[in-house]
A protein has these predicted regions:
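Active-site anion-handling motifs in enzyme catalytic cores
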Residues: 1-176
Length: 176
């Protein structure tokens, strides 16, 4: 969970009877989760987070669950442009604090940052961002990345994906 998500929940928790946290990787914020155990239903996308949330006295199949990342539920056919594959490989490595090395590859396209921002609650913009990312990836045979959702989308598109770790366990944990 990013700090923006934490801050949003912290500032709005009083407005809701229950809060459903969709599949996430969560590190820290133990006070938030302990203090709101009666309000939260947490979906984890990997075992490290699942074990962490259980350690805060959440009960499996009651208020903590494990499931796949939401990207796996995407109806890909709604977004395909059916562009032919005509480029060899895309380097889509992080250029932010989650980069493991900060060593950026030649011709790097941190495409997730292109559409990052505060507009993910706008369904139209979110769908178009997803479409643009998929259309970009469609052109390539191979995708090299340390971004989780780029790796998932490229895999769903049938690309050869070389998936690298980020600065903490998220990528490896979701992969496993």
């Amino acid at each position: 969970m990013y700090s923006e998500g934490h801050d949003f929940i912290q500032n709005n928790i009083g407005k809701f009877h229950k809060v459903i946290i969709m599949p996430s990787t969560i590190r820290g914020y133990s006070d938030l989760f302990i203090n709101n155990i009666d309000k939260f239903v947490v979906f984890c996308r990997e075992n490290i987070t699942f074990d962490y949330i259980k350690s805060l006295n959440y009960e499996p199949n009651k208020n903590v669950f494990i499931t796949d990342d939401m990207a796996f539920y995407l109806d890909l056919n709604k977004y395909l442009s059916l562009k032919p594959v005509y480029k060899k490989q895309a380097n889509c490595f992080r250029t932010d604090s989650e980069s493991l090395t900060g060593d950026y590859k030649e011709n790097n396209h941190d495409i997730s940052l292109t559409w990052n921002g505060d507009y993910w609650d706008n369904e139209f913009l979110a769908r178009n961002s997803t479409r643009c990312m998929i259309n970009f990836l469609e052109e390539y045979k191979v995708v090299n990345t340390d971004r989780l959702h780029v790796a998932i989308l490229a895999s769903l598109l049938g690309k050869e994906v070389n998936f690298y770790p980020n600065s903490y366990y998220k990528n490896e944990a979701v992969y496993n």
